[in-house]
Amino acid sequence: MQFGDVIGNKELKKTLAQMVDSNRLSHAILLCENNGGGALPLALALAQYANCRDRKNGDSCGVCPSCHKYRKLIHPDLHFVFPVSSTKELSESEKKAPISDYFLNSFTDLALRNPYFGEQELYESLDIDNKSGNISVNEARRIFEKLSLRASEGFYKVMVIFLPEKMNQEAGNKLLKIIEEPPQQTLFLLISHNPERVLQTIRSRCLRIDLKPMDREEKNTVAPASDNASMRGAITTLLEAVSRKDLAATFPIWESLAETGREKQKEFCLYSEEFIRKIFLVANGLESLADIHPAEEEAIRGLAKGLKPHFYEKALSVLDGVISAVEGNVNPKLVFCDMCNSLLQAM
């Protein structure tokens, strides 16, 4: 991945290249983004640039042996850590202490297909989408082991930590020691969707960089028209049934939602809240503030004509309650059946 391949943040890319060139690159950088906002491709481009043998015009050459391996994510000095959980495919010993190495091929395959992926897409790729992943102390030990070795080919050993907010206290304390006293020529690149949940002691040791949100054109470049298609279809069908006060038409929706994993259920609720806010803005003549994806436009315009003015606030409250219930492990069939009833009553 070269800087030229990364969408948006033009000035930031230039600044990072200058930091490498002047040997002023911080050894620990916390890249903060919205879910799927481009921090991973930026981190990969920075790592490739820092290890390139023939940098030119503020970008890596793309053809040297180091760049060739970075492009395929197979460079021996490039390491990844990300939240994981046990799966049936793991051995009994691996299930007791799952770490990123067990899922590395799935992670790199996903990153090569679409480096702008979000948390839920990661879990689906790892086949743990019915669970919340975490980064354990066993992972922190592996980080220490990997970074204690000398760089085999590159100028820098690079450790990319995706979602450090998923790290527990014990793991964080162990990682903190490595960040405070890093081995020579080590680069930590942390990518966070919720930086306030990253352990404060780790945040304070990192150079924090907040990525600018993508504008509409940039989002359309990244996301195909089918982006969020299944969730968009589900919430559209549900709201159309609600606007008609057709309880029976909601049954397939809540039954399907009840069958998915908790993380997918929460993602649906969060997407639905944003979708409903966009409908509200369009209904009130504030379309310019709605940031509507082209694939959403027809459904949002139609629903803006059918939902009552008092519906929106009540609906958001209902969805907030659903998220709390899902996090509390309440029976999902009860949760989503009640959600549909409550949305109908809100009309």
What residue spans do the PLM features occupy?
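Conserved strand-to-helix beginnings and helix N-cap segments that scaffold or border functional pockets
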Residues: 169-173, 266
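Conserved adenine-binding aromatic site and its adjacent loop/helix in ATP-hydrolyzing domains
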Residues: 145, 177, 204
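Conserved catalytic/switch belt of AAA+ P-loop NTPases
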Residues: 148, 173-187
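Clamp-loader machinery-focused feature within the broader ASCE/P-loop NTPase space
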Residues: 2-170
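Structural recognition of the conserved hydrophobic beta-strand(s) that form the central parallel beta-sheet
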Residues: 158-162, 175, 186-192
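N-proximal short alpha-helices
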Residues: 112-116, 132-133, 137-140, 148, ...
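Charged, glycine-rich active-site and insertion segments that engage polyanionic ligands
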Residues: 2-58, 65-69, 181-347
